[in-house]
Amino acid sequence: MLDLEQLRPFFASGVWQRIAAARQVLREEPFITALPAGEVVPEAAGRGKGAKGPGLVQGIADVVLVFDDHAEILDYKTDKSRNATYYIESYAAQLRLYRRAFALRLPVPVTKLTIYSFAMQDEIDIPLEYAAFGIGDKLLGR
């Protein structure tokens, strides 16, 4: 449960300013997308034609901000960790799949992936090279 003191920094943050400035704000946006199995499970890449077959990705994005020329995906986290590296290592693969799924649905590119940590009371940008399709897991040693 979040208390008011945990919410104050959020409403003073750049994240909140971007939410207010977006042309469209999609909240709790469900999606289901068929992707090549090698993108869904990187370990399957290169393992015959099964790795090229479809794998379903289903989820709910906390917030998708749509601007005139780009989109951003925002994921809220209530984990207790106060270490940005923890969030990047734990959630880059998830946001990589979200980015891929929404790239197929939106008329503009997804150019920013952000986690807002209520424990840290701060936003953490996921470097796009970590979230590149099929690259993030290699960078993280997975």
Residue spans of the language-model regions?
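Structural signature of nuclease core domains in nucleic-acid processing machines
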Residues: M1-R142
